[in-house]
Structures are given as C-alpha cells and as structure tokens.
C-alpha cells in the first residue's frame, strides 16, 4: 500500500473508502503502557498481570540464573514451624488460583498442581498444638483440624501429619520459560542485559533504545543493588540449595514437610529442600548444604534413592521480610517490584494486582510493603 506524506508531517494511508492519518511519531513507534525488567517469578508475573488486563508491555530479561529457576514454587499459606498464618495469606489465596489458571489457558500448558501439604509431626506435643491452633479463626480455613494418620509407603511418620489446605506448587521453570516464548512471539520480549544508562527519562515518558513506555517496572531480584534509582533499599540475599532425587519406590500425591520439603516433581523424581543461608561466599552449591539436606531427608525417607542434581540460587529477601513495591520518590513512573522471597509463587500474583490497582485506580499499598517506608 502506498503511503502519502503530507506537507504537515502527517501520514495518509489509502483504504477502500477513505484515508486516515496519524502523527508520524505514533507511526514510527508505539507507546507501551509499561516496560518490565527482570525474568524471575516477579517479572514474569508482572508481564502477565498487565497483559491479562489488556495493557501493552515490553519485557526485558537476561539469562542470569536466579533463585526462581531453583525454587520448587510451593505455595503454602501457613508458617509450618509455628503453625501460624502467612502475612496476608487469605488475600493472596483469593488472587493466586484465578491468576495462574488464566496464564495456563493462554500458554495451553499446565504450570500449577494443587497438591496438599502434609506437615509431618515430630512428636505428640506438635500434634496437640496443631489441633489446638487449627480451630482459630485465622487458621480454620487453612488447616484441617483432624490429623492425617494414613501410612505412606517409604515415609516414617509415627505421629501422623497435619494437612494444610489451599496449597500446591508452581512449575517455576515452565512458567518463566513458556512465558518468554509466548511474549517473544508477540514481539513483546527481549532477552538481553538491561543497561541503566540507556534509559532516558523526559517529560513523564521513558525510552530505552527504540522502546517507548509510560512507566517502567523493575523486578530484578538480587540485581536490585545495581539499580541507580532503587539501590538504597535494604536488600538481603539469601542462598538456597536443593536436591533433585530419583526414588522409583516412592509414590506421593502430596507434598511432605518435615525438616525439609519432599515434593513429587516428575515421574520418579522428587524435589528436596531447601536451605536458608544469609552468610555465603558465592552462588555455587556446597557439600555442607548437600549433607545437611541428606541428613534431614533420611530422618523420614526410608527408601533407597539417587541424587540426580544439586542446585543453588540467591533469593531476593528483605530485612523486614516484606516485599518492596512502589514508585521512585522523584520519578513517579519508575516502579520497583522485589523482595518476594521464598514465597514468591504465593505473594507475587497478589502484589502484582496491588501494583496494577495502585497505578490505574489509586488503590493504596499496605504500608508494610510500600517502599515509601524507606524514603523518608
């Protein structure tokens, strides 16, 4: 189709009955609603939150290995050491399943599995504590009161289990990798290292190379300290290590939680983890962590198994164990979305919805997660 350029810098495009015109600046580039930076659970969740709401995005992520690639993606609304609810658990659960279900439908592949978590009791005292706490108003929707005494072949559990409701796991690798393919096919994803000095901020608009956006959302995990606009936030890395084991004799339809989690992963493969270490020298797996996981696993797994893989990653955690969500004090269209920690698969969909609602409807963030708590 021939394009006609008018003397007034307008483009006219002939069609069947009439011509229409647009400003040349809009012809040569389209303004995205948001530019998203970061490829972990956080960045992937933001991409889908905006896309599912009909907003235009461009998403940039690199090949760096993050804790998201190591994580089991277990979503569990109960702190299983103290038998207490996770912060904002009920609100997070309201968002979680509808969000991941919508993503599954778009990807046409399964990314979540709604498996129960069985908390193995170590003694009779724990069992009694579970029964007592499970009837509390803030826990009765999260914990079954009656202990589970079903014997599982290969698992030693003399005192039985407490069953947590509304649990399961997100296949983090499938979620992230399939999402990148999905958005790349729509020219909305670039695999590259984000260069801060290439971001131009002018008159309330942003440009990064030939990408133009109304706002940018940084979801960079442990790269946050390198971000010139948000490096003041007190990020604390937390190293986590896990094992993938092969145990053909073990048949599980639930996630077992004892000193460590034991989760069915693929046929005859199980995820074991994880460690939590704030003092570390690098991201590589260590023999000490491997031995720790083995020792904890063998207190209750009584079947032969083979270690297939030993992985490690750094979790983006915060001093107060609350996410970093909000905008820059001076540049209002620069936003941060970080610090989801070890419960990212549970927290991120809810936090992403809050960010969307804040940006487009003015809904306020909970004070505990708003980065304004560090900007005064």
Where are the predicted features?
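Helical element adjacent to the flavin cofactor pocket in flavoenzyme catalytic cores
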Residues: 163-215
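Beta1/beta-strand and adjacent pyrophosphate-binding region of the FAD-binding site
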Residues: 31-40
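Active-site substrate-recognition segment that forms the wall
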Residues: 42-53, 73-74, 79, 110-111, ...
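Short beta-strand to alpha-helix junction loop
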Residues: 84-92, 162-178, 284-288
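Glycine-rich FAD pyrophosphate-binding loop
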Residues: 52-69
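Short hydrophobic core segments
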Residues: 37, 211-222
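Dinucleotide-binding Rossmann-like beta1-alpha1 core, especially the glycine-rich loop
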Residues: 73-154
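C-terminal catalytic lobe of FAD-dependent flavoproteins
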Residues: 311-376
